[in-house]
């Protein structure tokens, strides 16, 4: 009888811990992400969570176009590892793993430069001009066009969103920040 209660308790703990796991489905749920940074007066929000050797991120932005996040640029956009989310009609979601070679671009996809797309999963939803884009990737992909994402300390990011769903369209709004990877900016 005692063993039965132990099994039930273990199942309860397992199910309870799964409820807090990130589900890359393009929908944010309460408690899904424990870290958040807010930019552009709330028009761009970045959420992130670490699980094992992976990072899960969500971008929520008010835009008719694409959304993007860049990691550890050297100057402006130069040498930045970037992820673009293009969220169109239901079922039409694209993710681009890119690398910016210059201060103001260009930022072609990693696969066009001899690298790999390191995005493990992605999803997005759009309601009017509100976009939710989620993705996951390894903290250290080993790709020469990807930056290692730390789980603690400061980490410089650049963020942007575009006027339409053309990956090459110039951003409507952009900025940079230093994140405290334990949570916040």
Question: For each predicted feature, which ranges?
Answer:
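Extracellular-facing/secreted segment signature in eukaryotic proteins
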Residues: 20-185
């Amino acid at each position: 009888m005692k063993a039965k209660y132990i099994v039930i308790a273990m199942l309860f703990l397992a199910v309870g811990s799964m409820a807090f796991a990130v589900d890359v489905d393009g929908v944010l749920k309460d408690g899904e992400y424990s870290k958040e940074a807010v930019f552009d007066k709330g028009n761009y929000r970045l959420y992130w969570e670490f699980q094992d050797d992976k990072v899960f991120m969500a971008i929520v932005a008010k835009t008719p176009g694409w959304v993007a996040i860049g990691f550890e640029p050297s100057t402006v956009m130069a040498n930045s590892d970037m992820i673009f989310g293009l969220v169109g009609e239901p079922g039409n979601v694209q993710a681009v793993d890119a690398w910016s070679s210059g201060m103001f671009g260009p930022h072609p996809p990693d696969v066009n430069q001899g690298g790999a797309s390191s995005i493990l999963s992605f999803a997005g939803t759009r309601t009017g001009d509100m976009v939710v884009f989620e993705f996951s990737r390894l903290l250290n992909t080993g790709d020469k066009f990807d930056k290692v994402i730390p789980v603690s300390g400061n980490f410089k990011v650049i963020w942007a969103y575009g006027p339409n769903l053309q990956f090459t369209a110039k951003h409507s709004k952009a900025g940079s920040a230093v994140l405290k990877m334990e949570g916040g900016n």
